[in-house]
């Protein structure tokens, strides 16, 4: 086979990576119980004892595994 026959026919391949933005800086709580805008962040315990923080814009669930690693889940 010559190099021209080895080329793939059709449109060229393009790699596409989607990067999801993180929460804007104003939505991240800087102090426990408060967000950056001065609003209060409500804390709860879930069914399995995981910590849940809920503010006006988002909810963060912190789960603890048996290997003592924290898993952050955006709700």
Swiss-Prot record:
Keywords: ERV, Nucleus, Transposable element. May possess a function in tumorigenesis. Protein expressed at very low level. This Np9 protein is encoded by a human specific provirus. Transcript detectable in many tumor cell lines and tumor tissues. It comes from the Eukaryota. The lineage of its organism: Eukaryota, Metazoa, Chordata, Craniata, Vertebrata. Residues 22-43 are annotated as: Disordered. Its main location: nucleus. This is Endogenous retrovirus group K member 24 Np9 protein. It is found in: Nucleus. Residues 32-43 have a biased composition (Basic and acidic residues). One of its GO terms (cellular component) is nucleus. It comes from Homo sapiens (Human).
């Amino acid at each position: 086979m010559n190099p021209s026959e080895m080329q793939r026919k059709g449109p060229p391949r393009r790699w596409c990576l989607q990067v999801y933005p993180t929460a804007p800086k104003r939505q991240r709580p800087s102090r426990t119980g408060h967000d950056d805008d001065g609003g209060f962040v409500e804390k709860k315990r879930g069914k399995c004892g995981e910590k849940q923080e809920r503010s006006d814009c988002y909810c963060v669930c912190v789960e603890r595994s048996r290997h003592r690693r924290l898993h952050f889940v955006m709700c």
